[in-house]
Amino acid sequence: MKKVFFLFSMVWIVTIRGQNSFSTHIIHSLESKIDSIVQAGIQNKAYPGAQVLIFKHDSVRLNKSYGFHTYDSIVRVENHHLYDLASVTKILASTLAFMKLYEDYNIDLNRKVSDYIPLIKNTNKKNSTFMEVLSHQAGWLPYIEHQKTVRRKNGKLKGRTLSSIQNNRYTKPLTDSLFIHKSYKKKIMRRIKRTPVEKIGEYRYSGLLFFLLPDLVEKLSGQSFDQFLDSHFYDPMGIERLTFNPSFKFPKEEIVPTEKDSLFRKTLVHGWVHDEAAGLMGGVSGNAGLFANASSLAKLLKMFLDCGQFEGKQFLKPETLELFTSRTYPNSDNRRGLGFDKPSLDSIPSERYPSEKCTTESYGHSGFTGNLVWVDPVHQCFMIFLSNRVYPTREQRALYRLNIRSSLLDEAIKADLAF
């Protein structure tokens, strides 16, 4: 009997050691593949540096930084450094806050947005519903280039726009040396109000509602947009490196720069939001403005993956997340959820965005500065890719040409670590 027990124990030990060895091999194999893809991007000047975080099944399998802040190779990217999230802000700030409003204030998604936001009550947008606008099917314009309205033909700044001197009229910084007139936000709102509406019922991406959501948050909750997010999500989840206007909180050497802007700001955009409209909103906006490192974002995505729960606390109801992250109009050619992006509907798997490996239940969002966050609940996986592909200019297109984000997501999903 003792011999049998001894032999069983030895087999169990060998099996466990074999499993641990197999696990280590898979992790090293995943890291090697990710390294190869990211380094190829750096070598082809898709971006000077990046962060990648991959969570699979039960733990973080990779959390790594690559390259430098810029191509001069002076400041190496580290895991605590912050990237400009661009439109990823739409799901990790404005949609996140709106989901909480939906729960706490019983918002009816089929009611008109104008019932909640009086700004558009007597406009061509008065009949648009939250369901339509959040899924980009209301015919609203994609974007307004506000930055093209602040300078005269001779290049000088117009009155009540920007100033190189901060005072009681020009209060909020756009950059270290440009300050925004306190009434400029009203101009942005008026322009949104007056934009045309085209082809209601057809899918057309629009970011305009996300400029309006922060005011809705304040109207219903009594808290500013950033305070609401901090108090309901970021602070109780222990997220310390996720913020608007990072220059107020962190040293510049911990913030990755974006673009050498020769047209609008006429300086390197560093520590301030890259998106021009969000910048003119004072850096706090629902369309863009968040900065973070990958580790901070992982907590939010883990909460999404765990049906609204994080470390034993329920932040959102499972049914809320399921509603917002599912296709809103599944019988149409619109792939979108409510605020969230979804896989494209291409019939050829190799052409499917963002990856041929991700399931139809997956969701996430990309960002213009070179980011992607994606959650796949079926594979119990999420991936975070942060980069500054717009350095030195937004004309850098190698990130798209090399299909880097899709390749990374392919590898993240393929790395089956359940054994």
Model-predicted regions and their roles:
Residues 35-38, 52, 58, 84-110, ...:
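Active-site SXXK
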Residues 51-53, 63, 84, 132-135, ...:
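Structural recognition of the beta-strand scaffold that forms the well-ordered cores
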Residues 17-38, 154-172:
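Sec-dependent signal peptide cleavage junction
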Residues 365-419:
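Structured C-terminal helix/loop/strand segments within mature extracytoplasmic catalytic/sensor domains
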Residues 25-85, 106-108, 190, 268, ...:
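Short, conserved catalytic-motif segment at the N-terminal edge
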Residues 1-25:
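Bacterial Sec-dependent N-terminal signal peptides
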Residues 125-361:
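Short, surface-exposed loop or secondary-structure junction motifs
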Residues 108-123, 236-237:
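Short, glycine/proline-biased beta-turn/loop segments that scaffold the active-site neighborhood
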